[in-house]
């Protein structure tokens, strides 16, 4: 039976390392010796069948596999009876208290033993296939993926295959060439024949691909991986010369100017492109060439297919400037760099420099790398350099960190949202005012955050490797990952400050002030001096004109680092609380930070009064954070036009059932779009309720808040959980991400703040 293992790792292995005893690590293992009871097996099968039956209605899984395990291990039984509120009935303080206690008791029960909250953080259909591609090429597919792994990966593909045979870029999206080609190749590499698979999965996918022009219409990223696999020719891709790494770092086209994720994808790809690496052309690869292309492989004019992209995949078309640049490099620059003498000197020097940076990034992240797109590319680059090398073996030891199991099957995560979910969840629990009842939960969560803070900067001379400092920050996931994140740091800092005001006998010893100062230093470093907005990973400042060179047809704003409303708002809240407790530490800088950050948030407000959410869906998410930041800075409905307009947006967006609901289409279209039929979701409703409470709506007319909370209370499930509904996360405008814990965190937080701040009858 599958089991989720927490904070475990082989400490005797020479290939795996940890900075904090694996705190936050979460890996799935199949234990053939685990004696599952008939009841356990029945629960798991019921969850799988329920998802499969409703898979076209609710795309994100409820993430039940580990929840069933944890609740069973803790023998959790919900003892607080459910409450429902009738249409004309008032919500009393007693009713609100019961709802809060039910949600808090369930949420506490699903905390891991190291203090964090596990959860799925997946959704893109292109995360897992490159792991399969890489392991197939290197000959380690069967060693890493057991029969049980393959079974669950196929289950995931079957569950998320659309009725037309294709897969989207993400689980909610329409069928795309990118998702469908990746899904098809994955099924074939895992052992299915061309006409195998549940409900003719392979044949249906292949038909979709060929009906939409064949594999030559796959977007640029897909062309790269297919060239590596031997299903495409490098001559059919855009140039990615490694020589850019040899330029001065201040040069506008040096990768140092790129957003970190973009830079770390380009890094191994430029190495593989520079070597023109192609995996072994096996009989299966030769079969796939015939199956995926609509004309004989040897007759394809590769030069002409470089700019092709299937219409369903095209969100961000290439600019004329970009196409001229690609063509210039393809026709002039690359032929020079690949001929003597430059191929013997300059190209080899560039490849050596690129590999040096790959090793630096691998070592800095304990061979986890920054994310799931980068991981298989860096792992493959290490194998190409030395198939029996230590670096590749260290990569293999961290592959399992990326895989997640749900009732819909096995998928790959971004890496994990351990710290982010924990920081938000702890604030929701703190708002409950139930310290005596949930003290152990709070203490464990506090302990996790203290152990998860990044204590050092990246190894060695990090500035020459184009890295920002990380000491004092928190990551999105765990400490071993090492990549600093501004809003994760701000939300974790808020938690630690709140815990510092509580009894150490209850929540443990408070964090040392010097570590708080380190966190403050990091946040201050990422504010844009011109706009006042806060970046996420590294300083923003590279020319936005570089976005014209975005080669990824289905994503936007990924070439350079930007500033974001949500991150800025989180930092304001953290600094206001920090300033209260440490009024003399960097006072002038913090005061100036808050003033400029408020101006930035006000400037970013849209015409309808909302704020665009860059990391959550979408205008409801962004508005909740923006209103919270403005309110923390002392802005009110009476002295701030932005708050008045934000409230007006939320009130107009409320649905007839009292809740709120927003379509993921808001993100790519950049226009607020309600769900079909103006349906509501518990997460969007909670975000709107929190936003209205931040803005002081209860002081004017609490009716909209009461209606929203009534929707939340009546949506509560028997055991204290909330229903999984629409997907809630996003990145780069057009790719959705499933934050499975949001359905617990935000409704609990909204109920708790409602009980604390909205006057209710006894």
From Swiss-Prot:
Query: Do you know which PROSITE patterns this protein is assigned to?
Result: TERPENE_SYNTHASES
The chemistry this enzyme catalyses reads: (S)-2,3-epoxysqualene = tirucalla-7,24-dien-3beta-ol
Pathway given for this chain reads:
Secondary metabolite biosynthesis; terpenoid biosynthesis
Q: Which residues form the active site?
A: 487
Q: Which UniProt keywords apply?
A: Isomerase, Repeat
Which terms does the UniProt entry file under GO BP? triterpenoid biosynthetic process
Q: What is its EC number?
A: 5.4.99.56
- Name the InterPro entries for this protein: SQ_cyclase_C, SQ_cyclase_N, Squalene_cyclase, Terpene_synthase_CS, Terpenoid_cyclase/PrenylTrfase
The ranges of the PFTB repeats are: 100-142, 150-191, 442-486, 516-562, 594-634, 643-684, 705-746
> Where in the sequence is the signal peptide annotated?
none
- Is this entry keyworded Membrane? no
MF (Gene Ontology): beta-amyrin synthase activity
Is the keyword Repeat in the record?
A: yes
What is this protein's tissue specificity according to the annotation?
Answer: Mainly expressed in roots, bark, wood, stems and petioles and, to a lower extent, in older leaves.
Any one of the GO CC terms: lipid droplet
The protein's matches in Gene3D superfamilies, at most eight in alphabetical order, are given as: 1.50.10.20
Q: Which domain of life is it from?
A: Eukaryota
The UniProt similarity line reads: Belongs to the terpene cyclase/mutase family.
Q: What does this protein do?
A: Oxidosqualene cyclase involved in the biosynthesis of quassinoids triterpene natural products such as ailanthone, chaparrinone, glaucarubinone and amarolide, allelopathic degraded triterpene lactones inhibiting the growth of other plants, and possessing antimalarial, antifeedant, insecticidal, anti-inflammatory and anticancer activities. Converts 2,3-oxidosqualene (2,3-epoxysqualene) into tirucalladienol, generating rings and asymmetric centers in a single transformation.
Q: What is this protein called?
A: Tirucalla-7,24-dien-3beta-ol synthase OSC2
């Amino acid at each position: 039976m599958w089991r989720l293992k927490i904070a475990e790792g082989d400490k005797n292995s020479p290939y795996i390392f940890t900075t904090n005893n694996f705190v936050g690590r979460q890996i799935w293992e199949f234990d053939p010796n685990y004696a599952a009871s008939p009841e356990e097996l029945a629960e798991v099968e019921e969850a799988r069948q329920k998802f499969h039956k409703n898979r076209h209605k609710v795309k994100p899984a409820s993430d039940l596999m580990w929840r069933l395990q944890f609740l069973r291990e803790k023998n959790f039984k919900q003892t607080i009876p459910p409450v429902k509120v009738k249409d004309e009935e008032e919500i009393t303080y007693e009713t609100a208290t019961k709802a809060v206690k039910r949600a808090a008791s369930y949420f506490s029960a699903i905390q891991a033993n190291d203090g964090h909250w596990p959860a799925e953080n997946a959704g893109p259909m292109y995360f897992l296939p490159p792991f399969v591609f890489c392991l197939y090429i290197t000959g380690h597919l069967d060693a890493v993926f057991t029969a049980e792994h393959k079974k669950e990966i196929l289950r995931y593909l079957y569950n998320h295959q659309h009725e037309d045979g294709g897969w989207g870029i993400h689980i909610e999206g329409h069928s795309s060439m990118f998702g469908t080609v990746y899904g098809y190749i994955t099924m074939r590499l895992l052992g299915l024949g061309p006409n195998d698979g549940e409900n003719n999965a392979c044949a249906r996918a292949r038909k979709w691909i060929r009906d939409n022009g064949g594999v030559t219409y796959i977007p640029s990223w897909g062309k790269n991986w297919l060239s590596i696999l031997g299903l495409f020719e490098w001559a059919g891709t855009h140039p990615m010369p490694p020589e850019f790494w040899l330029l001065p770092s201040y040069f506008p086209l040096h990768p140092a100017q790129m957003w970190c994720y973009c830079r770390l994808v380009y890094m191994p790809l430029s190495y593989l492109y520079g070597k023109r690496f192609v995996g072994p052309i096996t009989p299966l690869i030769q079969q796939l060439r015939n199956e995926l292309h609509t004309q004989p492989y040897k007759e394809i004019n590769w030069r002409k297919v470089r700019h092709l992209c299937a219409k369903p995949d095209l969100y961000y078309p290439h600019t004329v400037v970009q196409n001229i640049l690609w063509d210039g490099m393809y026709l002039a620059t690359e032929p020079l760099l690949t001929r003597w003498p430059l191929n013997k000197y300059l190209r080899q020097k560039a490849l050596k420099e690129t590999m040096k940076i790959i090793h630096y990034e691998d070592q800095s992240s304990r061979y986890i790398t920054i994310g799931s797109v980068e991981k298989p590319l860096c792992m493959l680059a290490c194998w190409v350099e030395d198939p029996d090398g230590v670096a590749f073996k260290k990569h293999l030891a961290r592959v399992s960190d990326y895989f997640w199991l749900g009732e819909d099957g096995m998928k790959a995560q971004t890496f994990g949202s351990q710290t982010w979910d924990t920081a938000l969840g702890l604030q929701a629990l703190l708002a409950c005012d139930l310290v005596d009842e949930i003290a152990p939960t709070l203490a464990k969560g506090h302990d996790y955050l203290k152990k998860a803070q990044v204590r050092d900067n990246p190894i060695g001379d990090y500035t020459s490797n184009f890295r920002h400092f990380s000491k004092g920050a928190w990551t999105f996931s765990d400490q071993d990952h090492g990549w600093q994140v501004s809003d994760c740091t701000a939300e974790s800092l808020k938690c630690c400050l709140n815990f510092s005001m509580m009894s150490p006998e209850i929540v443990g010893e408070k964090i040392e002030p010097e570590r708080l100062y380190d966190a403050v230093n990091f946040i201050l470093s990422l504010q844009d001096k011109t706009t006042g907005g806060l970046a996420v990973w590294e300083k923003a400042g590279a020319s936005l004109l570089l976005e014209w060179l975005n080669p990824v047809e289905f994503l936007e704003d990924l070439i350079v680092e930007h500033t974001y409303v949500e991150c800025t708002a989180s930092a304001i809240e953290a600094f206001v609380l920090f300033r209260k407790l440490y009024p003399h530490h960097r006072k002038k800088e913090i005061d100036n930070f808050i003033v400029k950050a408020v101006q930035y948030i006000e400037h970013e407000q849209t015409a309808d009064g909302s704020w665009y959410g860059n990391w959550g869906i979408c205008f409801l998410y962004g508005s909740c954070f923006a209103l919270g930041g403005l309110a923390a800075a002392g802005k009110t409905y009476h002295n701030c036009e932005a708050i008045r307009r934000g409230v007006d947006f939320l009130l107009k967006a409320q649905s007839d059932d009292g809740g709120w609901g927003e379509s993921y289409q808001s993100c790519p279209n950049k226009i607020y779009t309600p769900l079909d039929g103006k349906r509501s979701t518990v997460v969007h409703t909670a975000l709107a309720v929190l936003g209205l409470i931040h803005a002081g709506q209860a002081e004017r007319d609490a009716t909209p808040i009461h209606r929203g909370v009534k929707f939340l209370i009546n949506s509560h499930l028997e055991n204290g959980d909330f229903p999984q509904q629409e997907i809630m996360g996003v990145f780069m405008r057009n790719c959705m991400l499933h934050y499975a814990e949001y359905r617990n965190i935000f409704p609990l937080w909204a109920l708790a703040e409602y009980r604390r701040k909205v006057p209710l009858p006894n």
